[in-house]
Amino acid sequence: MAAKIRQNDEVIVLTGKDKGKRGKVTKVLPNGKVFVEGINIITKHEKPVPALGKAGGLVKKEAAIDASNVAIFNPKTNKADRVGFRFEDGKKVRFFKSNNEII
């Protein structure tokens, strides 16, 4: 099955502490989670690893967010939108459901 949200798509967060924020998808996991640039930032406590020359401390990093909690952003309407699939010239393409424009 084709993915409705793919890497480098601009998305908007629908629920949670970052609701309403926009960002670019950096990674899509096969279990239905996505990493969005600058969204869902967590603080990890990391131990130092002297063998690798890595210092320990508090590290801020992006955590995965469920794909159902984000929607693709339509730049024409400036709103979140749904994605549909159709065949054009023998190829499967994604399109915005609000205005039928190909993504």
UniProtKB/Swiss-Prot annotation:
Say yes or no: keyword ATP-binding present: no
Keywords per UniProt: Ribonucleoprotein, Ribosomal protein, RNA-binding, rRNA-binding
User: What does this chain do?
Assistant: One of two assembly initiator proteins, it binds directly to the 5'-end of the 23S rRNA, where it nucleates assembly of the 50S subunit.
Q: What is this protein called?
A: Large ribosomal subunit protein uL24
Q: Which GO terms describe its biological process?
A: translation
Tell me the domain of life. Answer: Bacteria
Instruction: Kindly indicate whether the keyword Ribosomal protein belongs to this entry.
Output: yes
Q: Which gene name belongs to this protein? A: rplX
Q: Which GO terms describe its cellular component?
A: ribonucleoprotein complex; ribosome
State the family it belongs to.
Answer: Belongs to the universal ribosomal protein uL24 family.
- Output one GO MF annotation: rRNA binding
List the Pfam families.
KOW, ribosomal_L24
Share what the entry says about its subunit structure, partners included: Part of the 50S ribosomal subunit.
| Alphabetized NCBIfam families for the sequence | rplX_bact (TIGR01079)
SMART domains, A to Z:
KOW
